[in-house]
Every structure is written in structure tokens, then in C-alpha cells.
Amino acid sequence: MGSMLLASFPGASSITTGGSCLRSKQYAKNYDASSYVTTSWYKKRKIQKEHCAAIFSKHNLKQHYKVNEGGSTSNTSKECEKKYVVNAISEQSFEYEPQTRDPESIWDSVNDALDIFYKFCRPYAMFTIVLGATFKSLVAVEKLSDLSLAFFIGWLQVVVAVICIHIFGVGLNQLCDIEIDKINKPDLPLASGKLSFRNVVIITASSLILGLGFAWIVDSWPLFWTVFISCMVASAYNVDLPLLRWKKYPVLTAINFIADVAVTRSLGFFLHMQTCVFKRPTTFPRPLIFCTAIVSIYAIVIALFKDIPDMEGDEKFGIQSLSLRLGPKRVFWICVSLLEMTYGVTILVGATSPILWSKIITVLGHAVLASVLWYHAKSVDLTSNVVLHSFYMFIWKLHTAEYFLIPLFR
């Protein structure tokens, strides 16, 4: 009988039996006839079982069960007395302690995520690109009355499109160059492990879908084709497939930058404002031609100069940049000379402007840029990657300043 009752009690781990019972048949008969297990005993037993189960599942208890079975049998009473003692020792408190998250820790997590995304987007380039899109849109402005609500809505559409293009480009570049960036740019989120490969794929694909979808929704074919062509050119530059990976070849690199930044975006953003916002016929005014020409030179310079600080990683992975072929010093002075010649030509062209204020601003503005560039170039240490990278950032600043002058050329 003791073994039967113990088998029906699953929580017991060690049982000590004290006393004796009749053999199974006689005991079963007497048990059916006179049982001392009352209804209250069953309830108590059920509560004990549920309590033990809760302890096991929620509090990781170390449980010790001690079951003392004692009883006596006689011919007259034929009784069995049982006593069950359950001792549970918990390593944790039974009281529920709610875990509250510190608002400061939540804010720190959000701030860290935004900082990682900020670095992922390469803000120095994004700022210049957004500013460039703004001033390329201003090229379509012919009179002050054009600066209306419709213009600002069209400008916002251009900004959304160019941000999507930029995020797709930097995301694809980091995905395709992750091993190179571990050498050249180890602080980038993907190369440093702060962003996972999967997350960067999601961000990159989402930016492409959002850019194309947005251009489709606003019903602007110039904007749609600008997003599409820019993303395809970025793919040709980065993706390592046959006939692609143009970044391996200096000439194709320059063509890539000119086709994307100078031609596609300049024409696309201008035509979006001209035909979709102002509802005017397609034209190619003098400021647009000037914008395309000067931005093309900047695109070539940036394409060539960006490889100077990255020579170590490029050489290891077989990218034959112009810096590796000619040496960093020659490429450095080629870039500086290209910009100086561009400023000189721009000064001459600006002097022919029929509008006095445009003539003065164009000539003086580019004379200042040429002087500042030459002053900084003479003090650059060509053996220091840190200094070269700093000068590369300086070229981006010159590029940004140029965008302020482009809309004023008439």
C-alpha cells in the first residue's frame, strides 16, 4: 500500500517507510472498506502538488522532500496512518520584484543606435550631397516668385530621393568592401562589428525600394530615373561580378563618378523642378551646363583622391588605383592642379557674365577658393594617412562651398 500511494505522489524524491501493512489483497480490501483519507486530505495534497510545481517552474528551487510514513496494523482496527512532510528550500525570494528599466539607459541605447547609423551614412558626404541637390534645384529658379510652396515641396521630394540614393550607395559599398574597410576604415559600423551584415543588407535594400517607390508615388519620371540610374551605377562600381567592380580601374572610377554625381543627378533634379514642379518645357540653361561641368571636375578629383589614404587595403585586395600606379605624391598634385585649373576657367567664364552681381560673386568666390586650396596643399605631409584623410575632408568642404556659388552663376 505504501508503494502504491508513493507512486501516486510524483513530487517525492526520497521516502522512508516506518510501520507495516497487510499484504496487497487484504490491504486493498480493507482500504476500500475503511479509508482514513478524507476529502480535506485530498485538497491538502492537491494544494501541495500545485505549490511545488509553481516553485519548480518559476523560482528554480532546490527542493528536498522528506516523507515519513508511519502506521500500525492490527486485527481489529486494520489502520494505516501516513504522514507527509514536504520541505522546500528556495534559493530565491518568493516575492516578485518587478524589473524597471532606467529611462537614462533607454535613452543611451537610442542615442548609441543613432550614432551608429550616423557614422554608417558618412555624414560629411551626405551633407554635401543634400546641399548639392538643393542648389541644383535652385538652378531651375528664374525669378523670386518661383520660390513658392510648390518649389519647397518639390525640393523636399528631391532631398528624400537623394538621401535614399546616398544610403544605398554607402550601404552597398560597405557590404562589398567589408574586408578592405577592416584595414582602411576600421571605424565604420560594419567593419567594426557595430552593425551586422544582415542589418546593413536590410537598410540598403530598404533605401532602394523606398527611393523608387517614393519617386513613383510623386509621379516624377525624372526623379524615378535619377534614383534608378544612380543606384545601378553604384552597383556597377561596387559589386564584384564580371564586367563590374569598376573601382578596380581608375578610368572607369572617374567615369562612374561623373555619370552619377555630375550628369545624372544634375539633370534629374533640374528636370524634376523644371517639368514636374514649375510645369515648364525642357531646357538646358547656361547655369545647368556650368553646374554639370564644374561638378564633373570635383567628381574626378574626389574619385582619385579618396584612394590615396586607402592604398594599403587596395593593394592587398588587388585594386589597382591610380595612387598605387603613380604614387600618392603625383596623384595628390594632379588633383590639386585639376581644381586650380577649374577655378581659373570658372573665373574667366564668370567674367563674361552679363549680370554684374553674378560676375563679381563668381570671380571673387573662385579666386578665394583657389587661394585657400593652394595654401593648404603646400603644408600637407604626404607620408601621413591622417593628414591625407584630413585634406580629403577639406576637398569635400571646397565642394560644399562650390554649391553655394553655382546657383549665382548667370
Swiss-Prot record:
Any single GO molecular-function term of the entry would be: prenyltransferase activity
Where does it localize? Plastid, Chloroplast membrane
Q: Activity versus temperature?
A: Optimum temperature is 75 degrees Celsius.
Q: Which EC numbers does the record give?
A: 2.5.1.70
Q: What does this protein do?
A: Involved in the biosynthesis of sophoraflavanone G (SFG). Can use flavanones (naringenin, liquiritigenin and hesperetin) as substrates, but not flavonols or isoflavones. Shows a strict specificity for dimethylallyl diphosphate.
Q: How does it sit in the membrane?
A: Multi-pass membrane protein
**Domain of life (superkingdom):** Eukaryota
Record the organism: Sophora flavescens
Q: Does the keyword Chloroplast apply?
A: yes
Keywords of the record, alphabetical order, are: Chloroplast, Membrane, Plastid, Transferase, Transit peptide, Transmembrane, Transmembrane helix
Alphabetical list of NCBIfam families matching this protein: PRK12887.1
Work out whether the entry's keyword set contains rRNA-binding: no
The portions of this protein that span the membrane are 124-144, 150-170, 195-217, 222-239, 251-271, 288-308, 331-351, 355-375, 386-406
By what name is this protein known? Naringenin 8-dimethylallyltransferase 1, chloroplastic
Q: In which tissues is it expressed?
A: Secifically expressed in root bark. Not detected in aerial tissues.
